[in-house]
């Protein structure tokens, strides 16, 4: 084979053609990677910019013209635009400390001075729904994954895996109506203390949604454990259950923890199920029978509303989204740290 024609069978006539094609593929891959980085950066910039506008929304602007700045003493006063004469009510200023530590969320009802923006009322609803969902998804997902990986016959596995994948492909709005029309009446049949909208029904539906995620990822982690570890356990006289729980699961703990944290992030960011089944009354509660509102539920309510883009109530959507972004990012970083720690331990 001539140096200028190393790969004639693949259609390349010269080294220059090979290098040109390789450079093109490399450039395309680099552009895709750069696009993902720029998209993430743009999301972060938009979130934090709009959240900053929320905390600076004590400034009243009319068609780009500065009108006045609100203070705690002047909140609720009426001012007029010097250009068009339009009337504006000065909003009560919201500090970051009041937002992040407040427990009352009431931005839609009452005067401007009565509006409350305590994000813990929304965080509590998100936490209780996520907790119920994880109580369903984590144990059932782990048990299902162990069964599929260690016990199930290949024919049974070939039937169960597509079923789980179908569950993962069902639209979340279907889960929301299922929670509202099936799970809630079932809960009320066993206990009449459940409201029509409640956190338990939403949490159960979100848990069913996350079950395929947990089981699939955990099974992949279990399948990645070397066969030699299992054979060593059997050689020592261990039973299948002992090998599964004392050898395989600890060896796959890195992937298992990553699956759990990914599922938690999924539950925290779930939108349609909680918007349909949990309710829209934000208040600080840990009673799973009560209606509640999550952070994503509030964002949906504001996105579908008729508030002005300069209104403090509308801008609160971005402040809540920033808190949600920080929570999910913290979970992702924690997942990477846990995965690296246990990976080093078992390698």
What does each of the following model-derived ranges do?
Residues 1-33, 335-347:
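Transmembrane alpha-helical segments of polytopic membrane transport and secretion proteins
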Residues 26, 140-179, 217, 345-347:
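Cytoplasmic-entry segments and transmembrane alpha-helices of multi-pass inner-membrane transporters
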Residues 12-23, 28, 48-133, 153, ...:
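Periplasmic/extracellular loop-to-transmembrane helix junction in inner-membrane transport proteins
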Residues 165-210:
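Generic hydrophobic transmembrane alpha-helix motif, especially the helices
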Residues 217-218, 225, 234, 240-278:
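Transmembrane alpha-helices
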Residues 41, 45, 139-144, 163, ...:
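Membrane-embedded alpha-helices of multi-pass transport/permease systems
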Residues 189, 274-325:
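Interhelical loop and adjacent transmembrane-helix boundary motif
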Residues 219-223, 227, 234, 261, ...:
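C-terminal transmembrane helix and the adjacent membrane-cytosol boundary/short C-terminal tail
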